[in-house]
């Protein structure tokens, strides 16, 4: 605010879960328009909004700021072209589907879905801690990462992959990385059983190699 800079919040993953987790009683730190310097927020509907891919949102503090998003060009032979974004023609199916999902779930539906997510995350945290893993940071929403103080996490991942579990990995530090959904609560018990078995395999000397691909 002192520098009169536009502060944008990239809430593409957490934007449609954090407000409802807060409504459910969790102490979620301010990240949104509660902070006076925040001018805009992006949040993907296809993640924790549970909508089809192809629909996302950008929110502005007030209507006057929206003008800076509009693409307005007349420096070409086709005449003046104005679109809400840099993109031209976009299919409306994903937008219509998002409208239907959001109206169907409503605030109560989203609160229930996000409670299922945080319940699943807490169950994972408890289970992996009992297996000797260390939780990275202090998860509050639907993502959790955990490392092991003595075992090769990538070797454990390889064993889990062979059992049909396709999760993410982090590199610094090495950790298993999960993005949980309401469905996952029903499979956590099986996941933890397979994780325990994978640990025993690695302890017994069954190791392998895991290639590295970075997302940027």
Identify what each model region corresponds to:
Residues 1-3:
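Active-site core of PLP-dependent enzymes with the aminotransferase class I/II
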Residues 11-15, 47, 173, 182-184:
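Active-site-proximal loop/turn and secondary-structure-junction residues that shape catalytic pockets
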Residues 111-114, 118-125, 129-131, 137, ...:
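Non-catalytic terminal extensions of PLP-dependent enzymes
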Residues 8, 13, 20-140, 147-150, ...:
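Active-site C-terminal subdomain of aminotransferase-like
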């Amino acid at each position: 605010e002192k520098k009169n800079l536009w502060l944008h919040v990239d809430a593409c993953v957490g934007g449609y879960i954090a407000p409802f987790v807060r409504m459910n009683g969790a102490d979620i730190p301010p990240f949104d328009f509660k902070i006076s310097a925040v001018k805009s927020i992006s949040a993907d509907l296809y993640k924790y909004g549970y909508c089809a891919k192809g629909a996302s949102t950008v929110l502005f503090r007030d209507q006057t700021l929206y003008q800076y998003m509009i693409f307005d060009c007349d420096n070409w032979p086709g005449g003046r072209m104005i679109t809400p974004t840099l993109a031209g023609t976009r299919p409306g199916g994903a937008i219509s589907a998002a409208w239907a999902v959001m109206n169907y779930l409503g605030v109560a539906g989203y609160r229930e879905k996000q409670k299922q997510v945080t319940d699943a995350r807490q169950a994972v945290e408890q289970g992996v801690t009992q297996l000797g893993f260390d939780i990275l940071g202090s998860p509050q929403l639907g993502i959790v990462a955990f490392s092991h103080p003595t075992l090769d996490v990538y070797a454990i991942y390889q064993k889990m992959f062979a059992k049909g579990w396709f999760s993410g990995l982090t590199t610094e530090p090495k950790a298993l990385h999960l993005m949980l959904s309401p469905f996952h609560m029903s499979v956590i018990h099986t996941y933890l059983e397979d994780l325990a078995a994978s640990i025993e395999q690695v302890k017994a000397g069954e190791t392998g190699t895991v290639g590295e691909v970075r997302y940027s």
